[in-house]
Structure formats: C-alpha cells, structure tokens
Amino acid sequence: MAEAHQAVAFQFTVTPEGVDFQLSREVLKHIYLSVIRSWKKRLIRIKNGILRGVYPGSPTSWLVVVMATAGSSYYNVDISMGLVYYIQRWLPEGRPYRTPYTRTLFSMAIFSTGVWMMGIFFFRQTLKLLLSYHGWMFELHGQTSHLTRVWAVCVRLLSGRRPMLYSFQTSLPKLPVPSVPATVHRYLESVEHLLDDEQYYRMETLAKEFEEKTAPRLQKYLVLKSWWATNYVSDWWEEYVYLRGRNPIVVNSNYYVMDLVLVKNTDVQAARLGNAVHAMITYRRKLDREEIKPVMALGLVPMCSYQMERMFNTTRIPGKDTDVLQHLPDSRHVAVYHKGRFFKVWLYEGSRLLKPRDLEMQFQRILDDPSPPQPGEERLAALTAGGRVEWAQARQAFFSSGKNKAALDAIERAAFFVALDEESHHYDPEDEASLSLYGKALLHGNCYNRWFDKSFTLISFKNGQLGLNTEHAWADAPIIGHLWEFVLGTDSFHLGYTETGHCLGKPNPVLPPPQRLQWDIPKQCQAVIESSYQVAKALADDVELYCFQFLPFGKGLIKKCRTSPDAFVQIALQLAHFRDRGKFCLTYEASMTRMFREGRTETVRSCTRESTAFVQAMVQGRHLNEDLQRLFRKAAEKHQNMYRLAMTGAGIDRHLFCLYVVSKYLGVESPFLAEVLSEPWRLSTSQIAQFQIRMFDPNKYPKHLGAGGGFGPVADDGYGVSYMIAGENTIFFHVSSKFSSSETNAQRFGNQIRQALLDIANLFQVPKADG
C-alpha cells in the first residue's frame, strides 16, 4: 500500500558528468523538526532532573534564602557567622570578582546555596523518616490518634507544592527485610488449618530446621543486598518470576483490561481508535514531562512511580535462557495489525502530534486497504505466543538481518502495538455470554492478532469497542489502569465526536499513508510459526472464562455492614470455593508495596484460620446470625490486618522467595524453601484499582464504568479471579479455569460467588439495591 510513498532524504543518479544528488526539501524539513523535537525533550528532561533533584526546594525558595542573607548583611547582621567572609577570602583574584562588592555578592550566593541544599537534604531525610511510619494504617476508621494527626501535618508541610511525577522517589523509604522468625511464624500460621496434624508437624520440623541452621546465613546476604539495592525484591522478582519463564506468556502471564461497557461513544472503529491513540500519546507526553501527579494514598502518602517509566516504547525481547526488556527513550510511530498485514503509522507530522481526525484517517486507510498478507505474515505474531526458546531461536535465525529485521524493528521499537480486529464485541446485559466472549478476545484473541511481547496491545473491535492486552514483566495492573482511566476520560469528556461518530475537526489529506511492513519469511520459519500457533491455540482453547456483573449491591451496602469491601469479597470467595470444591486451599491475593521505593507486589494469604471457621459455620447452617456475624467480623479483621502487613513490608512470600534465590546463588539446599515455593495457588485473586485519576465525577456519570480485567488460572486445577468493586451498586467478576481440569468450572464457581455474596449480605439484613 505505501511502498511508493516511502520517504527518502535524497536520491541520486549517475550521469556522464558524475553523480547527481537530488535533496528532498520535505524530508530535510522533517529531519530538522525531528532534531528540534529531540533537543526540546532533552532540555525538558534536564530541567525536570534539576527540579526533581532539589525538591521540595525550588528556585523561589533559593532566591528567598539569598535575599535573606543579603538583607541581613544590609542591616549589619551576619547570619553566616563569618562563613561569607571565609568564602570571600578563598575566591580567586581577578574577574569576575574584581570589586569587593561583587566578591561579597558571590560569597553570599555560595553560602545561601549551601544552606539551601542542606535544608533540602534535611527535609528529604525527615520526610523519608516520616513516610516510614505506618501506624496510621492500623488505626480504626474514625479513630485517628494524636500521633498520626501530628505525623500527617508534618508530612503535608514537608511534601512541598506541585510535586512532579518522580519528585518523591528519593524520599520513599526502602522496603524493609522482615526477620526470619517473624516470616516463618506467619507462614506456619497461614497453612496450619490447611494441613492435617501429620503434615503440619512435618512442615513445622522443616521450618524449625531452616530457621535455626540455614536461614541465618541467607538472611545476612539478603540484608546486605537491601543496603545497596534500591529494593531487595523487585529486580529478582522481575527476572526470575517473569523474564526467565520459558513457557508461553499468553494466558500464563499477560492480562487484559476492558473498555467502558455501559456507555458507548461511537460505533466508528477508526474514530474511536483515533481518539484513544491521541489520548495515549498525550499521556506519554505528560509522562515524559513529569506533569502527571504522583498517586497519593489518602491524598497524603506518595506511591512509587518508577514502574511508569517503561509504559511506552517497551518490548520484551526473547532469549534462550532469559528475556530482556528493551526500553527506548522515544518512538514516533505505532505498529498496526489488520487482516494478516502489519503497518507502521507515524504519530507526528514534523514535530506536531497528529490530531485525532488525522489518526482516524490513517486507520481508515488501513481498514480500506485490500492487499493480501505476504507468505508467512498472517500468523507471524504467533511466535510471541509460543514457547520463549523457540521464539528466541527463530528471531536469531530469521529476523537478524535484511528486510525482516527492519520490519521487526518497526514493531519492537513502536510506542505500542495496535490490533484492528474484524469482529465486534460488547457487553449486552441481556446476553450473559457477551462479557465472557469479550474477555476471551482480549486475553488471547486468535493467538496471532496480538503482539504479546509489547508492553501493551491496544485492541480495536469493528464496533468501536476497545481493550488492552498487557505484558506483565514491566509493571503491575494499577500502572496500566492509570493510563486507561486517562484515555477513557479524555475520550469521553475532552475529545468527543461529531453527530455521525467521527473525530472532531478536518483531516489533512496530504498526509502520507501508513507504511506496509515488508517480510521475506522462508518455509522453515513458517513451520516454526505454525508450531508456535498450535502451542498457543491449545493454551487458549483450554481457558474457560466467565465474566459477569454482580448487580444486587456494591460497596455501598458492604460499608453498611461496617467492613472492608475487599475483605467482604475475599471471604465470599472462600465460602464459594468451599461450596464448589468441598475443601480449602492456599489463596493468593495481590497487594501492592508501592509505599516503598521501587515496590511492586506482595501476597496476602487470604485463606486464614478465621475465614475457614466462618465458612464452616455458614455451611453447617446451625448457628445464629449473631454468631455468624461475629465470626465474619473476626475473619474480616484478620484479613485487613494481613493486607496491611503485606503493604507495609511484613509479608511472607516475597521474603521467602528472596531467601530461596540467595540459597540458589550459594548452592545451599533447603527442603523447607523448596516445598514452600512449589505449593500451588489453586485460587489466585486480585482486586482491580479504579479512580486513580479524577477525570470526572462518578456520582454524576454512574454508567461511565469499565468492567476491569482478568487473567488466566495460575494452577491447572485452580481458578483465577479478578474483581472490580465498580461503584456503590455493582461488582464485576472475571473467573478463569481450564476445561482440561475435571475439578473446576468457571461458570459454576461464578454462580457460587454470586450466592456467597448474597448469603453473607443476608446475615446483616441490609436492604439491597434493585437489580
């Protein structure tokens, strides 16, 4: 389609007089504008680096200190206690210090700058110390202590005004290393009710032997690492949990995010995509300029923002032993897949970001292009869905030179990947299966219409519905959720559409069309592609996904029960699982540790002794409501306490994981660690964050709700459950399992979740919403 329009900076022809160069003014103009844009970005980064480096100080505060020093000198008050005079003596003779007056001014400026820098250092260290206090998390709602109130005032005073995205990074405390006895004790407490007496005695013996003999040496190395590393967990977690995994990342690692499902802005596929891509690049520009406000817990405690750095221009590159994340400082295009063809779409005209209407025109050109796929091109992306070793070998053998390398570079160096699907998906409340089919399309598609290695793939369906498929190694779900909230809010409330559903404005018809990527894929490579496709297809076909909207109530009713919404849902999941399987199991709930620098996640083992006691009492059906309420509140309090411990660095699993990594480096065998890390998570759960950005008033626009997202089951005979408490009156659930397991059924478990929520709510006899 676009071969004839490929831009070249110059052409040359051989004549009798020699070689005649013909420079293209248009291309040189674009090169010039590109250089200008690149330098502008560098200058912005330098400026932001300086402002970030002196935060919470500012040029204004520096000027105040200088003026205070000069003013005191005017009134013959030496607040420097002779230091200004001492500095003046050491200034070299001659220019620019020729007169005593200029020497004095320079001395005052140097002294003031030193005082200013010392103040910044003091404020930062004090703020870091204050942010290490987590007592506020363990206080009952509405019962704030005097200590916490004083702490909050101090944090607010030291946090400065108008912080940039990364302003607090150096003030965040490091993730603390828990003590081995505390971790072992909490671990044994988490499994005691899941094991019989003989199994528990055996595990207790292994734990005691580990604690006394093996752990002290491992702990010393781990503490040593925590001293010099920014975070003692995150780099190993990224490498060993994600990048060293050799299994396919589709279903096993990548997750999906859904669009708004109760409102629709347009049915025009290219228009919706044009607005979304424009909003994403606008977000990237804000990200580069650090104009995005850091996420603050309670509007007071900053969360770590480092994961956002690799949101765009990032690709997971396969390797034989381990993958690597390739992140580029900038990218001016997106890669697009449609009907088996790959395209390169430029996002800028010179230094100007294309308007939504221009982007709509470019995507419509791709939709209208009738050209067929090249041999081997249609299913090429299946390589990213198959085994990692096979992909690494194929990449080295067939994509390391020539046009294949150039085309692959265009994809891997893109800002992100776009999939233009030919089918339609949406949520129809009257059709229960519609949400599940939508989720399946986002999770794996047809296994070759997503580039699973990109940081994220933006998926556009024929009816204008959108969604994301996200690679997991570079960041966790709240990070991509932050971007998605911005995109959906910008699309609905800032960009808008015409009455006919197109983007606002007029397109620029002289824009060169998208560039078709060229491939030369030999038969041997096509065989590898087909093999990877069959592997991925078997995985995808085995996934049973059941997504549903729970309408009877949401967090509004749960709050009336005077309990945490997350604890309420987690206990309901335990009740549902016991009814479904007739037994309890290790349960994984993801929590975050972003109150610490470069923190990612920690595990909450939410199947507790207290929750099992409540479930057993519910199932027996012989207890009074008052007794059941008491057991429920006890279970909810235990869950909340465990969640708080995980968030404040006192979790179990990341500590044991790191001790295991140290043991492998040292060649030390630990039966206890080997057994703990091989235990299957048959119920893996996660709550989806929302309203991280206030783009609109949810009370005024209650139907502007996304349905969250989901992931595949972690264990072959287990369930994966994600949920989003989407408002006062609704909860979305995404339940996954495998068809190949005779013990699990996603829809059956989803129905058990529904009933468990209703049964627990009935204990409190609180009226439910209609629906």
UniProtKB/Swiss-Prot annotation:
Give the similarity note: Belongs to the carnitine/choline acetyltransferase family.
Family matches, as PANTHER family: CARNITINE O-ACYLTRANSFERASE, CARNITINE O-PALMITOYLTRANSFERASE 1, MUSCLE ISOFORM
Name the Enzyme Commission number(s) assigned to this protein: 2.3.1.21
Residues at the catalytic site: H472
Coiled-coil zones: none
The broad enzyme category this protein falls into is transferase
Spans through the membrane: 48-73, 102-121
Q: Which residues lie on this side of the membrane: Cytoplasmic?
A: 1-47, 122-771
Broad class of the protein's primary localization: mitochondrion
Q: What protein am I looking at?
A: Carnitine O-palmitoyltransferase 1, muscle isoform
Q: Cellular component GO terms, alphabetically?
A: mitochondrial outer membrane; mitochondrion
Q: In which pathway does it act?
A: Lipid metabolism; fatty acid beta-oxidation
Subcellular location field:
Mitochondrion outer membrane
Q: What does this protein do?
A: Catalyzes the transfer of the acyl group of long-chain fatty acid-CoA conjugates onto carnitine, an essential step for the mitochondrial uptake of long-chain fatty acids and their subsequent beta-oxidation in the mitochondrion.
A Gene Ontology molecular-function term?
carnitine O-palmitoyltransferase activity
Domain of life, per lineage: Eukaryota
Pfam families associated with the record? Carn_acyltransf, CPT_N
Q: Which reaction does it catalyse?
A: (R)-carnitine + hexadecanoyl-CoA = O-hexadecanoyl-(R)-carnitine + CoA
Native source species? Bos taurus (Bovine)
The record gives the membrane topology as: Multi-pass membrane protein
Q: Which GO terms of type biological process are on file?
A: carnitine metabolic process; fatty acid beta-oxidation; fatty acid metabolic process; long-chain fatty acid transport; response to blue light
UniProt-annotated binding residues for CoA: G554, K555, G556, L557, I558, K559, K560, C561, R562, T563, S564, P565, D566
User: Residue ranges, Mitochondrial intermembrane compartment?
Assistant: 74-101
